[in-house]
Amino acid sequence: MYRHKLLRKLYNYRPSEGEEQEALKETTAFVETYKDCFERSCPVGHLTGSAWIENFDGTKFLLSYHRKLKFWVQLGGHPEPGEHDILQVALREAKEESGLKSIVCLHPEIFDISIYRFSDGKEPPHLHFDINFLLKAVDPKETIKVSDESEDLRWFSEPPQYDGNQDVDNIFRMFNKWKQHQQRSL
């Protein structure tokens, strides 16, 4: 039952061409097939909720220098046990990982979809089916606070430099979508 809300979002989503189209197809099939798609115990993988967060005036976006991955990524994470609303997962994770309480959803529909192969040595290799939403930190007086999951948090106006060893096409794709969103909002 709880998968239906997410499946409606997936069926209505129009991805960018290429890699994201394939990610949408695979994510939709995963959610249709696995009733435990929100649970970390699902052997194939699980859903994660992430956030592209813009600042109060829409001029910058927030990224985390991830403690385990060792490069800049959008904020996000796993559903808690029994949590089945992926937008709420993204909002909760964004607030927890940034320390910002004023984060709101700019649009309740999916902003981007990616799939990551994950292996940390503690768990068997599995997939993260990552659903991203466009969020906004609306209070200009709030300051970001680095959580245990990050080494750093920073507002950017352009994507950071990467050394070429990371799969970060999604960061550039989301940056371009965000710029298009800003143009439409003018």
Residues covered by each model-derived region:
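Generic N-terminal amphipathic, Lys/Arg-enriched alpha-helix
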Residues: 3-14
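Acidic, metal-coordinating catalytic segment for phosphate/diphosphate chemistry
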Residues: 12-50
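Short, well-ordered beta-strand micro-motif
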Residues: 53, 134-136, 154-157
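Conserved Nudix-box catalytic region and its N-terminal flanking loop in Nudix hydrolases
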Residues: 59-100
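Active-site segment of metal-dependent pyrophosphate-handling enzymes
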Residues: 99-141
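NUDIX/MutT-family hydrolases
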Residues: 143-174
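Compositionally biased, intrinsically disordered linkers/stalks adjacent to structured regions
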Residues: 173-186
